[in-house]
């Protein structure tokens, strides 16, 4: 049985300009105290064609975590436009939130992200080189895709066994009929890389 359950992920300040930070309010519950940190990551999928373009926007350590319910706001800077292929700058991609314990990923929450020009003129005649300053980012918050992984909470030597299922506790319908791509359980998408900082539980 998993020692940590994600109760809710709320997408904050959405939609936003492309260069605005990502902000998620994450609520989770620990069935028993965890001696070590949980590591949360926000990953931006730069291209559906290759994981080479994934960007780890931030990584944060939360813990040690006492038993009970906890909430924190996870903020990460927008992706680096220079690392996104020009052909993938406009349109639909994915942002992922992952959590690991002892180096083992046990949950992944993915959202579709639609980047589009607000100006009708730019929509009809987009510039050859994407103008990120004119793009709006809209996260489809009502349709998360949740993938869970069985891990050994007491021994990180065990290998992971991935299972995908519906998380009714997140309070939204999960489109499980969609076709998984590259093992993510995410339609038309993928996952990334970067620094760590420490955050205590609230």
Curated annotation (Swiss-Prot):
One of its GO terms (molecular function) is histone binding. It is found in: Nucleus; Cytoplasm, Cytosol. The keyword Aminoacyl-tRNA synthetase does not apply. Keywords: Chaperone, Chromatin regulator, Cytoplasm, Nucleus, Phosphoprotein, Transcription, Transcription regulation. SUPFAM superfamilies: ASF1-like. The modification Phosphoserine is found at residue 198. Phosphorylated by TLK1 and TLK2. GO terms for biological process: blastocyst hatching; DNA replication-dependent chromatin assembly; nucleosome assembly. It comes from the Eukaryota. GO terms for cellular component: chromatin; cytosol; nucleoplasm; nucleus; protein-containing complex. Its main location: nucleus. Residues 1-156 are annotated as: Interaction with histone H3 and CHAF1B. Belongs to the ASF1 family. Interacts with histone H3 (via C-terminus), including histone H3.1, H3.2 and H3.3, and histone H4; the interaction with H3 is direct. Interacts with the CHAF1A, CHAF1B and RBBP4 subunits of the CAF-1 complex. Interacts with HAT1, NASP and TAF1. Found in a soluble complex with NASP and histones H3 and H4; the interaction with NASP is probably indirect and mediated by H3-H4. Interacts with CDAN1. Found in a cytosolic complex with CDAN1, ASF1A, IPO4 and histones H3.1 and H4. Interacts with CREBBP. Histone chaperone that facilitates histone deposition and histone exchange and removal during nucleosome assembly and disassembly. Cooperates with chromatin assembly factor 1 (CAF-1) to promote replication-dependent chromatin assembly. Also involved in the nuclear import of the histone H3-H4 dimer together with importin-4 (IPO4): specifically recognizes and binds newly synthesized histones with the monomethylation of H3 'Lys-9' (H3K9me1) and diacetylation at 'Lys-5' and 'Lys-12' of H4 (H4K5ac and H4K12ac) marks in the cytosol. This is Histone chaperone ASF1B. It comes from Bos taurus. The gene is ASF1B.
């Amino acid at each position: 049985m998993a020692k940590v359950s994600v109760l809710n992920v709320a997408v904050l300040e959405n939609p936003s300009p492309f260069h605005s930070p990502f902000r998620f309010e994450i609520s989770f519950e620990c069935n028993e105290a965890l001696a070590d940190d949980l590591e949360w990551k926000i990953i931006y999928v730069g291209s559906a064609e290759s994981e080479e373009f994934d960007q780890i926007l931030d990584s944060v350590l939360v813990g040690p975590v006492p038993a009970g319910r906890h909430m924190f706001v996870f903020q990460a800077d927008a992706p680096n436009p220079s690392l996104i292929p020009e052909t993938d700058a406009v349109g639909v991609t994915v942002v992922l939130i992952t959590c690991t314990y002892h180096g083992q990923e046990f949950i992944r929450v993915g959202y579709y992200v639609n980047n589009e020009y607000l100006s009708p003129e730019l929509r009809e005649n987009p510039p050859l080189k994407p103008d990120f300053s004119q793009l709006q980012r809209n996260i489809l918050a009502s349709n998360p895709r949740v993938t869970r992984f069985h891990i050994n909470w007491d021994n990180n030597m065990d290998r992971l066994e991935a299972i995908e299922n519906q998380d009714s506790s997140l309070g939204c319908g999960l489109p499980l009929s969609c076709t998984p791509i590259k093992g993510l359980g995410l339609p038309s998408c993928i996952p990334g890389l970067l620094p760590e900082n420490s955050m205590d539980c609230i």
